Amino acid sequence: MQWDLFCRVVDNHGDLGVCWRLAADLGSRGETVRLWVDDASALAWMAPQGATGVELRAWPEAEDEPEPGDVVIEAFGCDPPAPFVARMATRARAPVWINLEYLSAEPYVARSHGLPSPQRNGLVKWFFYPGFDAHSGGLLRERDLLAQREAFDAQAWLASLGLARRAGERVVSLFCYDNPAVPALLGQLAAQPTLLLATPGHAARQVRAALGDTLARGELRAIELAHLTQVNFDRLLWACDLNLDRKSVV
């Protein structure tokens, strides 16, 4: 089938990361995907190798863009362009239109997943909520991901980045927005041997502001990571004892 996946980049790479992962996974299963993005610049480091079956397209502006595919996904309520939606309504067989929502464990997911939203042009938009139980849309996961994780060698992967865990040291990653609690967090981490891996952008900037150029305090030492590909970001999570990810601990 032909899929059209629409993504507007807001901040901190999460929206584009989810959409790329979905597009690449669909492509690996033999599907054909057009990924429409208003700012795809982060893919230069996130997925420099591209993906089989995935065509990256700039956000459509012209009236003469390709005919909509069999499935149209708008990520996080980004609203496909009106001319594209109008062409969706003229297809002999209307495409399946999915609004991909944010991952959540809240109770509303069970109530909202799979609900239809009839549109004035006769199309129906369906709400898709990822989640953690059978009442949700589940989780996006590549078919061989668990096998890769089982075979993963954390020490070897850290060494490939020029890093090494010292004896008795825990490894912690930090990926976050600007947060006034970061200095207090670093103070707590400094109480026992900790290697903190700070991702580029918000996290690294706040860590440097709190620790200074030494990037160290007490038992804590911090490293500012370079941008990682999506594949290597998975491995970062696997290599750590604790992952502090935006607003949640994973």
In which residue ranges do the predicted regions lie?
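Extreme N-terminal starter segment of soluble prokaryotic enzymes
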Residues: 1-4
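Active-site and donor-binding regions of nucleotide-sugar-utilizing enzymes
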Residues: 6-122
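A donor-sugar binding/catalytic signature common to diverse glycosyltransferases
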Residues: 20-23, 82, 227-250
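Hydrophobic/aromatic beta-strand patches that form the interior of the parallel beta-sheet core
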Residues: 34, 57, 73, 96-98, ...
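Short His-Asn-centered micro-motif
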Residues: 37-38, 59, 74-76, 100-101, ...
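A short acidic, often aromatic-flanked loop/helix-cap motif at beta-alpha or helix-coil junctions
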Residues: 61-68, 105-107, 134-137, 204-205, ...
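A nucleotide-sugar donor-handling region in carbohydrate enzymes
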Residues: 101-183
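Donor-nucleotide binding loops and adjacent catalytic segments primarily
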Residues: 156-158, 164-235
